[in-house]
Amino acid sequence: MCKFKEPTAIRSQLILMPQSLDEMVSQQEPVRLLCEVMDRLDYGRLESSYPGGGCPAYPPRVLVKLLTLAYSMGQRSSRKIAEALRVDLRYMWLAEGLTPDFRTLARFRREKGDYLQELFEQSTRLAVEVGLVLLAHVAIDGTKVESVAGSHSLWGKRRIEQEREAIRQILEEAEEIDRLEDEELGDNDGTSLPDALRDVAARKRRVDEAEKQLRESGKQVISTTEPESRPMRTSRGVRMSYNVQAAVDSTTQVVLGMTVTQDENDRRQLGAMLSEVYRNTGCKPAVVSADKGYYSAGNLKILDEREQVGAISVPKLPPQCKRPGVYGIDCFEYDEIGDTYRCPAGKLLTFRQTSDKGNSVYRVYICGDCQGCLQRELCGAGKHGKRLDVNVGNSLRMRMERFLATDAGRAAAVLRKQVVEPVFGQTKENRKFRRFMLRGLKGASIETALVFLVHNVFKVMPKLAYQPA
């Protein structure tokens, strides 16, 4: 009896009844379901962007499917994707025998980025249609993704000074060498420029150009290879990065909106993300949550104006009482229903008027019952009674604090971490989305749209798999 199995095929032998690509890919292979979901998207605008004429182009829907499959496996190099089209049956099956080269894939990704972002938006609407999105709770958060630019491209005032000092030392050394050589060799060869001086001349041009860009930008630090990226704090220290924002539905962690920004902090992103969610779904979420990085008086006002229930973590503030023995605003109890404040002595302060001070709007509350109050000195009441000027942002802050103290508020704060942070974990760890491959803010937006398109498609796939035929 033979100990090992014999090969069933001889490589050089012709096959009488060759297998089709469809037979070579298992019916349970996820790429089949991926193709089915991708076929539900509308490629009309993308296809109409091709002028026609000349050599026929590769079908854009095929190129999108190939990029989606590659990104799902953490493969974003166009050369690696082109190689997979020659050796991986899943890619061959998805491309239906077409073999676009790496230049075609790279050019398509770069030039058709706007349409790729539209396809991401369609993926959110598809998730809504199949019942994966309920909009009961949407969590918003941001994460830093490193840009193409490396730390070697960073230029600041300090580095420019160091480079100029290094150039000065090189020139001094070169002059000293010239002097010694002149003494030794005389006029033997004075026509060629020494290598050291040729290198330092190019180095000086780079420093001059970096100094010019730094001065024109008005920033402390710039990247000469990718000026749109910004230095941001990441888990690996300060890196040139972009801030990727995502709004995620709590039902199945579908991404409902995304943006890429140059701002390191998240304070200016809430309004834009709410608009993205509404534009992509046509509905307003019941509750929106975000961490304290989104806290600002402006964001609280946005929630108030849109009548949007929000759960934004409120950072702790130092005590309002700056003068010892004098009550601060935090010592006064606010009644939202009656729009009144009650002082520590139990007396009522009622709303009288609004007042503009600088860039802030204040609501003025007056107590006319301060005569004979034993705590008047502690309260700091004036001749006509206690006047309390409350920044409009403070009242919204207190309203948010009261909501977060309720069962619903606490539940929303806890749920936020369970909704949005796993999405970033999946994209960064499983799909290796830690660094962009396209340069500039637009390139970063294109790649982010592709990554979240993949995320949403893979959320829809199980839903379709269990639907009856």
Please give the residue ranges for each predicted region.
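Anion-binding and metal-coordination hotspots
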Residues: 4-8, 67, 74-87, 96-469
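A short secondary-structure junction motif
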Residues: 40-45, 88, 92, 430
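A generic, residue-level signal for flexible/boundary positions that often mark functional hotspots
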Residues: 10, 15-19, 52, 94, ...
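Hydrophobic alpha-helical membrane-insertion signals
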Residues: 1-32
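Basic, short loop/linker segments at the boundary and entry of helix-turn-helix/winged-helix-like folds
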Residues: 25-68, 73, 396-398
